Amino acid sequence: MTLVYQSTRDEKNTVTASQAILQGLATDGGLFTPVSYPQVELDFDTLKDASYQEVAKLVLSAFLDDFTAEELDYCISHAYDSKFDTPAIAPLVKLDGQYNLELFHGSTIAFKDMALSILPYFMTTAAKKHGLENKIVILTATSGDTGKAAMAGFADVPGTEIIVFYPKDGVSKVQELQMTTQTGNNTHVIAIDGNFDDAQTNVKHMFNDVALREKLAANKMQFSSANSMNIGRLVPQVVYYVYAYAQLVKTGQITAGEKVNFTVPTGNFGNILAAFYAKQIGLPVGKLICASNENNVLTDFFKTHVYDKKREFKVTTSPSMDILVSSNLERLIFHLVGNDATKTKELMESLVATGQYQLSNFDADILDLFAAAYADEAETAAEIKRVYEASDYIEDPHTAVASAVYQKYRTQTGDTAKTVIASTASPYKFPVVAVEAVTGETGLGDFEALAKLHTLSGVPVPPAVDGLETAPVRHHTSVAAKDMQAAVEDYLGL
């Protein structure tokens, strides 16, 4: 039986996996979400010796069950290849008291590569499957990493255009240059004078604008998304949690069946939601620890069951988590209220109208899976230094948020279960923050800090940032947040 993906806001709006990938966001504003979970046989006696690609085949064939085996083989072999700088794709590193799952070995040195290297192949395969001749326009808001990873994935892919919006003052210098120097005739990057929430809200508005959709259709185009709102972004992220567990079994750190915790630095809630889906298909998960920075709306939600975005937006050293409207939480809410689309829609409309919603009558077993805490700026910097001094290993600030939150969790609960930290970016993406935390040195430029980081860590400077300083800037457009749609129409000649 083919798996059904339903909009979180309309029980009648159901599609297959390939249709969900092509649409990105449901036309009613909801997110396509599985209403039941596939049956997957996770035999870790076998999986411990499986390659990343083999684990991907097992997981993806379960969730994307209207793709043929040959189609998935094609997508997987083209995605997880020499673009990654290690055959392991996502190596697990044992540190003092924790395991870091390094998700930054792809072409843009951030975890988004894990899904965005395969999403273009999913899309072009799905388009062929449905005889779609429209040009697919990828419209994406980024808090720093998705934009570059999406453009790297879609650059010069036939039949696609990609337009990325980022907050002008809300990304690191390295992140900005990675985007503005992006090659590819179909790539477009636009800075906005707002924050990530402004960018994401306006992108969602464009997806839901019927008149704009009709204008696109008249020009043989249609929108899709490379954000984690797209199920094709989310499902590949389930793979690395299963792979990490298999590596723990392989190295004798755990026995098969032993429960493991995952601590995930969380902004838009996609990465930790993928860990939740891994649990739903049988991965032995103890706790999912949701780590936030000072934009701690999720920490408060898990403690009070009230989601309240009415608070100061803080610009931090972990910009990919500087988010107050956490889009993917909608999928968890949908599951928490028993897959009730009417109730989910009411809550989401309340968020727009009043800036908050309160959860009542929810599945306590699901909520009990999660623990949540946050790390402030000082704690994040201190954690980078602590890990370096303990393990001679430098974490990026997002990973350090998760690492610091895990230290708090362990102290407060006494939980000694093995814990994997999702290490979401290379420190080379945030060199100034990393070097300053370790050495106390201030006032460094980004490229000066890259050299110092190399000396401190002994890790080679990755190609993603090597030469960035002298790469030609190709994208110069900057607009007011309110003018985003006009910019899109201009680029597409509508």
Located regions from the model:
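PLP-dependent amino-acid enzyme catalytic core
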Residues: M1-L494
